């Protein structure tokens, strides 16, 4: 199912219900809250002096949007989105000085064509947040000391493989050929977070992370508090960088610390009692008591992974063109892909669709999944009914679309996809291109034309 480009249609809007209105004064700030969805049941239950807004009867799964205006008749500007995974919820609304009116709207995101439309138009601008695209050669580091502290889009990345954010808004990048983990701060500047930019091994730590060498780091996992775990592939280790910038070795990822065979993807539980990573044809697990084990094997070329709350592991097998669900007992089922590079497509069954080099899965709070393909250069959304939808198209060596609405499946905008994640605000982070870019799709509606 293909949607028309933004220029040809207006974003879907929910009906406003005047009966769902609450007005209160907070230190001279007048807030008008209008809330409803198709069932006319969404209701704001509280709006505190510090800007915490609470509601009930939201559609599930759904997306709630706060809009703001300087007058009760608008014009209204989308201010903030949040996914509704429960019928009740709350968020903090940024409070501005003077009179400001707010209203709340919600749309449902069921596994239907309209649900996909509602999801698409909750997102907005595509942008590059890191990478200048200077070079694309493998086994070459393009890092320069000049890049330290400059805007991240001025820095040349060196085959980055994943970008993941903490709750404070820092984005951490495993810059494989730069032998480092880079951090994009909330102000958009880039900094070395771990590694020396020279591949090798010079100790386990504890030591400042920027004094210890990494060797082709291919994966990372970031906790909400800013602790970062690194798959130090050619050093055969998983490293831990704490919030004070001190790096240690959490565990050896091979029996003797030799290089991991095609190491990709990493997940570490918050209590550090369980970890998973991919090693070529195997999904490996680690526990402090049991050490390393193979949970599942027989794959072609595993990529990234995500572990669900129930314990299932979602992985992409780039070589086999399948995404799998692997259960805690090691059994597996195909989640998406037909095992070839073509067939099916937008609006078809995910199991009938060729996902060329599917590499990276990530869950969406709707219950669906994002699936990013390396060779196909595409970002897909898999809904809970098993139907797949094309979110972002691409082609080899393409870098296009910055500053505009992200959705137009007819226009290539990305190239070789390596990882997709979602930050704590709902923005999508896409690590793509041999030239090395980190792209972001903002979870922010585009204001409708006045």
Functional labels for PLM-detected ranges:
Residues 23-34:
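Bacterial N-terminal signal peptides
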Residues 36-118:
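Short, composition-biased motifs enriched in small/polar/acidic residues
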Residues 65, 179-183, 236-240, 281-284, ...:
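A short loop-to-beta-strand structural motif that recurs across blades of beta-propeller domains
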Residues 115-159, 189-216, 245-265, 289-303, ...:
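Gly/Pro-rich loop segments of beta-rich domains
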Residues 165-168, 222-225, 268-272, 307-310, ...:
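Residue-level detector of Asp-centered blade-edge/turn motifs that repeat once per structural unit
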Residues 170-172, 227-229, 274-277, 312-314, ...:
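Conserved beta-propeller blade signature
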Residues 176, 233-234, 278-280, 318, ...:
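Short loop/turn segments immediately following the C-termini of beta-strands
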Residues 416-450:
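Blade-level signature of beta-propeller repeat domains, shared across WD40, Kelch, NHL, RCC1
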């Amino acid at each position: 199912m293909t949607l028309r480009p933004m220029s040809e249609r207006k974003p879907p809007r929910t009906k406003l219900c005047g009966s769902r209105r609450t007005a209160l004064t907070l230190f001279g700030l007048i807030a008008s809250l209008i809330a409803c969805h198709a069932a006319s049941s969404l209701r704001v239950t509280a709006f505190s002096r510090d800007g915490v807004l609470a509601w009930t009867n939201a559609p599930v799964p759904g997306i709630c949007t706060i809009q703001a205006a300087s007058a009760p008749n608008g014009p209204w500007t989308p201010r903030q989105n949040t996914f509704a995974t429960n019928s009740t919820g709350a968020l903090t609304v940024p409070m501005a000085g003077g009179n400001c009116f707010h209203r709340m709207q919600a749309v449902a995101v069921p596994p239907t064509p309209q649900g996909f439309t509602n999801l698409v138009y909750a997102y907005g601008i595509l942008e590059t947040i890191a990478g200048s695209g200077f070079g694309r050669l493998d086994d070459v580091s393009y890092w320069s000391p000049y890049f330290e502290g400059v805007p991240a889009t001025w820095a040349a990345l060196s085959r980055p493989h994943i970008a993941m954010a903490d709750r404070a808004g820092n984005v951490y990048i495993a810059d494989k050929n730069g032998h480092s983990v880079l951090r994009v701060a909330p102000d958009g500047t880039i900094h070395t977070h771990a590694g020396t930019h020279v591949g090798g091994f010079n100790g386990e730590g504890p030591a400042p992370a920027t004094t210890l060498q990494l060797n082709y780091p291919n994966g990372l996992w970031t906790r909400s508090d800013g602790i970062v775990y690194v798959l130090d592939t050619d050093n055969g280790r998983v490293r831990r960088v704490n919030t004070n910038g001190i790096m240690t070795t959490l565990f050896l990822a091979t029996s003797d610390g030799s290089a991991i065979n095609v190491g990709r993807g990493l997940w570490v539980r918050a209590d550090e009692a369980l970890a998973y990573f991919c090693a070529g044809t195997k999904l490996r697990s680690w526990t402090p008591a049991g050490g390393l084990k193979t949970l599942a094997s027989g794959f072609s070329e595993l990529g990234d992974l995500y572990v669900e709350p129930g314990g299932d592991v979602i992985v992409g097998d780039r070589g086999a063109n399948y995404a799998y669900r692997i259960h805690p007992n090691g059994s597996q089922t195909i989640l998406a892909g037909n095992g070839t590079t073509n067939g099916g497509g937008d609006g078809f069954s995910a199991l009938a669709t060729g996902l060329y080099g599917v590499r990276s899965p990530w869950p969406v709070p709707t219950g669906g999944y994002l699936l990013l393909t390396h060779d196909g250069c595409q970002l897909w959304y898999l809904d809970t009914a098993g139907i797949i939808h094309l979110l972002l198209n691409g082609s080899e060596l393409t870098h296009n679309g910055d500053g505009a609405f992200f959705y137009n499946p007819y226009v290539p905008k990305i190239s070789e996809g390596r990882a997709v994640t979602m930050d704590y605000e709902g923005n999508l982070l896409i690590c793509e291109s041999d030239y090395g870019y980190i792209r972001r799709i903002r979870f922010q509606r585009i204001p409708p034309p006045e």
